[in-house]
Amino acid sequence: FLGKSCDTLIYANGNALKYKANEEPLFDFHASVASIAEYIHNIKFKKFIHISTIDVYDNKTSIMKTKEDVNIDTNKLNIYGYHKYCAEEYVKHFCDNYLIFRLSGLVGKGLKKNAIYDFIHKNKKVMLSPETSINYINTRFIAETIFHIQDLGIDNQIFNLASKNTIKISDIENIIGVKTEYTKDAYLYVDNNQINTEKIGKYIKLSSSEEAIIEYFNSLK
């Protein structure tokens, strides 16, 4: 694709493995920051749509702390979140026309890196604490929303792209009717993700985490 041109470039590249970012920060920088520069400077486009993550927020414990315009303390970010934040800043600096979408937890056809997948496969154990709270969104809904926002002619904005609610990992058992086992280390750390969706909710009807999980679960049958 380098050296070519297009009307809209949707960039969903970069490292998606948080543990690898912490183990190999240089690798993560090249994968999530340097790589985006290659595309921005070597492809001619009219609009750049960047797929980012809610991990750019230094505090996700309340919806007031995950508003798109909140001041982010980069010193509190882990390596993964900091590099994703740097990538966003690069887009904002070099792209005259952009959209940035910060995604929550992903489920969708073909995806295997999530707790629901681990729930239904007996050879796997869930690595997240049952008390961890996550906002799940289906990849199908993500694509539909991005194209809808683009069609509205909205430019140079950041959106949290997430479902309207957060659930606990322990709730998944009741949602899909499947019990699971947890790894020993799963209980050591409890995460709490409360994502503000007020801004994007003005333009779309938000789905729920339960709907996202059920659709994904049915696709795996």
Regions found by a protein language model. Name each.
Residues 1-45, 54-59:
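NAD(P)H-binding glycine-rich loop region in Rossmannoid oxidoreductase-like domains
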Residues 89-135, 139-141, 148:
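NAD(P)-dependent short-chain dehydrogenase/reductase
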Residues 16, 54-58, 69-70, 104-107, ...:
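Active-site segment of SDR-like NAD(P)-dependent oxidoreductases
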Residues 50-65, 79, 106-110:
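Conserved catalytic-site region of short-chain dehydrogenase/reductase
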Residues 179-221:
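C-terminal amphipathic/interface module of NAD(P)-dependent oxidoreductases
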